[in-house]
């Protein structure tokens, strides 16, 4: 039994250790809305077992469920999977979303935190029931609905995610946070309460709750992608269907993005050449997340401006 169930090694040391390790890893994400009565006990159990199997990444636990983005050594993948399936009766059918690209650089540390909610939605209305969700749809239905002019697609991701990749003609709810989006989407889409609406996000957790929120606010025909963009791509590949998502999929780890189509729909902020390459400004007091092509990374030393470059 570990005395302190948290990481005690610096990120710099952990990064060096991971880069020196040659073992293959698989990057996955999963979530499940279900009641967790003792979040502290469940959080510690997750940490102990993930630590044992050298799992890295980010896990949020709350009384409404679990949300995780993690990197697992390939040799331990089925051990971790079986542990999760047996950690609670509600997880015996847990869907684990495999990333489109696996890289050992995705995460350097393991962080398992207790949160008020597994996704910060800002919803305080006690009458809201997040279990009354929209209708799940998979790739075949998605592709059919994309060609229907009477169907509205809504992207429930942040603006910087939308910028490098999205479905054709999908509406962007401009925001930097999910809780801000939920407020805006009701106002912006007020005219469409009787129209078919398809909501999507990266892995499903945000669009699932957003679909319930739309229902709660009087929208009648709400659909959402089963397991998000990742689930759509996997299902389309499995069934030999065309992938209609354009651009790259933003991911919340050190990879920054996963390429889905060859089409680049975004541009370098400094030279305006096509690029989908996100970086954080190299000047620590800035650390701005922005799109920068490889040429400008060299020219500006991975900084967002000449000012930041001069103050390195």
Curated annotation (Swiss-Prot):
It catalyses: uridine(34) in tRNA + AH2 + O2 = 5-hydroxyuridine(34) in tRNA + A + H2O. Disulfide bonds: none annotated. GO terms for biological process: tRNA modification. Residues 147-237 form the Rhodanese domain. The keyword Ubl conjugation does not apply. Signal peptide: none annotated. It comes from the Bacteria. It is an enzyme of class 1 (oxidoreductase). Coiled coil: none annotated. GO terms for molecular function: oxidoreductase activity, acting on paired donors, with incorporation or reduction of molecular oxygen. NCBIfam families: PRK00142.1-1. Belongs to the TrhO family. This is tRNA uridine(34) hydroxylase. It comes from Buchnera aphidicola subsp. Schizaphis graminum (strain Sg). The lineage of its organism: Bacteria, Pseudomonadati, Pseudomonadota, Gammaproteobacteria, Enterobacterales.
């Amino acid at each position: 039994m570990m005395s302190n169930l948290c990481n005690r090694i610096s990120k710099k040391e952990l990064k060096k250790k991971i880069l020196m390790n040659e073992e293959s890893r698989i990057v996955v994400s999963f979530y499940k809305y279900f009641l967790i009565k003792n979040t502290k006990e469940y959080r510690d159990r997750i940490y102990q077992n993930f630590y044992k199997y050298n799992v890295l990444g980010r896990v949020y636990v709350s009384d409404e469920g679990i949300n995780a983005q993690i990197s697992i050594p390939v040799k331990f993948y089925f051990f971790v999977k079986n542990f999760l399936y047996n950690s609670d009766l509600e997880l015996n059918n847990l869907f684990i979303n495999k990333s489109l690209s696996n890289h050992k650089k995705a995460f350097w540390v393991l962080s398992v935190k207790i949160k008020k909610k597994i996704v910060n939605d800002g919803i305080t209305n006690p009458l809201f029931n997040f279990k009354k969700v929209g209708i799940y749809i998979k790739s075949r239905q998605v592709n059919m609905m994309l060609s229907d002019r009477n169907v509205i697609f809504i992207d429930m991701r942040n603006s910087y995610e939308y910028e490098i990749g999205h479905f054709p003609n999908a509406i962007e709810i401009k925001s930097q946070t999910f809780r801000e989006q939920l407020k805006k989407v009701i106002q912006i889409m007020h005219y469409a309460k009787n129209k078919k609406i398809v909501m999507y996000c990266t892995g499903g957790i945000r669009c699932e709750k957003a679909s319930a929120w739309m229902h709660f606010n009087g929208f009648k025909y709400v659909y959402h992608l089963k397991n998000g963009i990742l689930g759509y791509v996997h299902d389309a590949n499995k069934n030999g269907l065309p992938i209609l998502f354009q651009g790259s999929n933003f991911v919340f780890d050190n990879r920054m993005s996963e390429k889905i189509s060859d089409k680049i729909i975004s541009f370098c902020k400094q030279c305006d050449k096509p690029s989908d390459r996100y970086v954080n400004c190299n000047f620590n007091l800035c650390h701005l997340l922005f799109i920068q092509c490889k040429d400008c990374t060299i020219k500006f030393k991975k900084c967002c401006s000449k000012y930041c470059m001069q103050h390195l």
